[in-house]
Amino acid sequence: MTRGLIVLLVLALTACGGEADSGEGGSSEGAELFSSSVLGGQAGCVTCHSLESDRVLVGPSLAGLGERAGGTVPGQSARDYIRTSIVAPQAHVVEGFEGGRMPTNWGEVLDDGEIDALVDYLEGL
């Protein structure tokens, strides 16, 4: 009887599961935000940034960003680099790209939870 209850409990907990992962990246909400062609009345991330390493749009490709970002600015974690690049894009302009093209008001357009979700997603790429 006790063994049956344990098995039933394990099955029930397994069936509950968690939030489905978006496949790439670490946040389904972040994936949705990234994929929106318009965010807060302006061009969304996907409009200017590709997720394909060999495809460059207006801004740099974000393929593998989570792996690259940690070593970009000495002493800054990948997560901090990505967050700063979103809320203060002029702080780190990628070599070969023109500064001033990315909107500088994402910190006002997106709330902290949305920025965190976007950072989670991009860090997982």
Over which residues does each language-model region extend?
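Electrostatic cytochrome c docking/interface patches
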Residues: 17-40, 75-76
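Alpha-helix N-cap and coil->helix boundary residues
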Residues: 25, 57, 77, 96-97
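C-terminal motif of bacterial Sec signal peptides marking the signal peptidase cleavage site
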Residues: 12-15
